[in-house]
Curated annotation (Swiss-Prot):
This is Pyruvate kinase. ATP binds at residues 34-37, 73, 156. K(+) binds at residues 34, 36, 66-67. Substrate binds at residues 32, 245-246, 278. It catalyses: pyruvate + ATP = phosphoenolpyruvate + ADP + H(+). Belongs to the pyruvate kinase family. Mg(2+) binds at residues 222, 246. The keyword Magnesium applies. Pathway: Carbohydrate degradation; glycolysis; pyruvate from D-glyceraldehyde 3-phosphate: step 5/5.
Length: 586
């Protein structure tokens, strides 16, 4: 199972039912709606289509609303474009004017109070660089030197690297879009241009005003101020997006890789999901294959510890949206296969602080590694059980069984979790049986697999994860008293006396009989297992099993009548149990 989650931006290239079905089948876990483009009616139609297709496919797909944020842009230029020449001077006005090579204006009138002489102003993703020469507050104008030649078009982005701006945390448009998202039941809000904790709390207040506790807030870190305040921001957030686009303009590009690693590490420490975004497979907007550098970029983000990787223009407006998702999926699977999960668990155990909450998670992860369990099945109301286990990055699949669709969608962003919605159970036994049955239904486990079940007891209460149980999936045919500590898999041979065994090849047979006498001993020596109805550690069956080192189970009631010949079974002498088919016993 792929563990790294894939976030896809939905736009004109991917909004159709046909293409959304392809993206979901290719591996999309979260659909991102970019509210910097389009109106609410367009996004409403996309939300409806995403839900329709995901329901039809029986797949869990979460929806992430990405706000436009308090960005700064230029106003319009004369004839739509002006050219700024290196070495010339240009005035940036706080009052809207039609842009010329001598003067243009910006949408943020308080810029004049935030910059100082020597500050840099970057235009159009940093393609044009200006340096503040003088400030005329009386006339609301900032005179700048043009440091490189370039064309400036309408409504281009403006960045102020190293400048603490006094922009609001969210704009009126953001608030309106967030309220729209609440009414539509989106799962995540990605907050653009977050600089300080108060920016996140402004959104939290909007959610609380609507009594909404289900939507998670994912701040996007895109500037130096956000980087500087990251610890405080994470304290009030539910996750993080490493938005490398504007970040690479606001800080030196060579600093981005190390900042990415640090931001991911801090999220890993707290067990909060982190998305790595921007230009991951950028060339696939135009080409059907990714570059080698892009493949390395995606893989290294996974090695850094990201929960999810994101596609932007590749799926929103690119020519090859399906191919981009498949490429992302294949890179993730390949990178995950190369992970040293033993070292990863050791590193995570040191990184994540010890607490009662984390105790069950680390115990489950260590047990899963040591016993090579097939899957970890977490019965969870809120998703916290599965998320706690995910912190430790177990190699085993994490199957989160929850009665809440909202919880399942929240888990869609978290590394390694495969969420399944299933009606809850009131008793512990029913809870465990339901968890096992659901795991089998996913086809990620099958009869004979060893799994770990974890849950909270009593059932139905949030935050009570306190139980871990090893469970062998499969039908238990019978049980008795085990002789020895080994196990064996083979075909049954039910016999009444030694005459039935003459001339038979017993090298792969498990003999099933009522009792053992001296005529059977020579044949038992050539068999690989023994099951008998006679009781006791001192019975002939037990003695021959011990002497010959053959996995043996004695005291199995009605063994000769209830077990058929030529049936593949597993004899677990350690537990005294007999399973149908192959079972991965300890």
């Amino acid at each position: 199972m792929r563990k790294t989650k894939i976030v896809c931006t939905i736009g004109p290239a991917s909004e159709s039912e046909e293409m959304l079905e392809k993206l979901i089948k290719a591996g999309m876990n979260v659909a991102r709606l970019n509210f910097s483009h389009g109106d609410q009616a367009e996004h409403k139609a996309r939300i409806d289509t995403i839900r329709k297709v995901s329901k039809r496919l029986g797949k869990t797909v979460a929806i992430l609303l990405d706000t436009k944020g308090p960005e700064i842009r230029t106003h319009n230029m004369k004839d739509g474009l002006i050219e700024l020449e290196k070495g010339s001077e240009v005035t940036v006005s706080m009052t809207e004017v039609e842009g010329t090579p001598e003067k243009f204006s910006v949408t943020y009138e308080n810029l004049i109070n935030d910059v100082e002489e020597g500050s840099y102003i970057l235009l159009d993703d940093g393609l044009i660089e200006l340096q503040v020469k003088s400030i005329d507050k009386a006339n609301g104008e900032v005179l700048c030197d043009v440091l490189n030649t370039g064309e400036l078009k309408n409504k281009k982005g403006v960045n102020l690297p190293g400048v603490k701006v006094s922009l609001p945390g969210i704009t009126d448009k953001d608030a309106d879009d967030i309220n729209f998202g609440i009414s539509e039941g989106v799962d995540f809000i990605a907050a653009s241009f977050v600089r300080r904790p108060s920016d996140v709390l402004d959104i939290r207040k909007l959610l609380e005003a609507k009594q909404n506790k289900n939507i998670s807030i994912i701040p996007k870190i895109e500037n130096q101020e956000g980087i500087d305040n990251i610890k405080e921001i994470l304290e009030v957030s539910d996750g993080l997006m490493v938005a490398r686009g504007d970040m690479g303009v606001e800080i030196p590009p060579e600093s981005v890789p190390m900042v990415q690693k640090d931001l991911i590490r801090q999220c890993n420490k707290l067990g909060k999901p982190v998305i790595t975004a921007t230009q991951m497979l950028d060339s696939m907007q135009r080409n059907p294959r990714a570059t080698r550098a892009e493949a390395s970029d995606v893989a290294n983000a996974i090695y850094d510890g990201t929960d999810a990787v994101m596609l932007s223009g590749e799926t929103a407006a690119g020519q090859y949206p399906e191919e981009a998702v498949k490429t992302m999926r294949n890179i993730a699977v390949s990178a995950e296969a190369a992970q040293d999960y033993k070292k990863l668990l050791s590193d995570r155990t040191k990184l994540v602080e010890t607490s009662l909450v984390n105790a069950i998670g680390v115990s489950v992860a260590h047990t899963a590694l040591n016993l090579n369990v097939k899957a970890i099945v977490a019965a969870t109301e809120s998703g916290s059980t599965a998320r706690t286990i995910s912190k430790y990055r177990p190699q085993s699949d994490i199957i989160a069984v929850t009665p809440n669709a909202e919880t399942a969608r929240q888990c869609a962003l978290v590394w390694g979790i495969f969420p399944v919605v299933k009606e809850g159970r009131k008793t512990t036994d029913a809870l465990l049986n339901n968890a096992v049955a659901t795991a089998v239904e996913t086809e990620r486990v099958q009869n004979g697999d060893l799994i770990i079940i974890t849950a909270g007891v009593p059932t139905g209460e949030k935050g009570t994860t306190n139980m871990m149980k090893l469970h062998l999936v499969g039908d238990e045919l019978a049980k008795g008293q085990g002789i020895g500590r080994s196990s064996v898999v083979g075909k049954t041979l039910v016999v009444k006396d030694a005459s039935e065994l003459e001339g038979k090849d017993l090298s792969e047979s498990i003999i099933v009989t009522s009792s053992v006498d001296e005529t059977l001993v020579p044949y038992i020596e050539n068999a690989i297992g023994l099951i008998t109805e006679e009781n006791g550690i001192t019975s002939p069956s037990a003695i021959i099993g011990l002497e010959k080192g053959i996995p043996t189970v004695v005291g199995v009631e009605n063994a000769t009548s209830e077990i058929q010949s030529d049936v593949l079974i597993t004899v677990d002498a350690n537990q005294g149990k007999i399973f149908e088919g192959y079972a991965n016993v300890l």
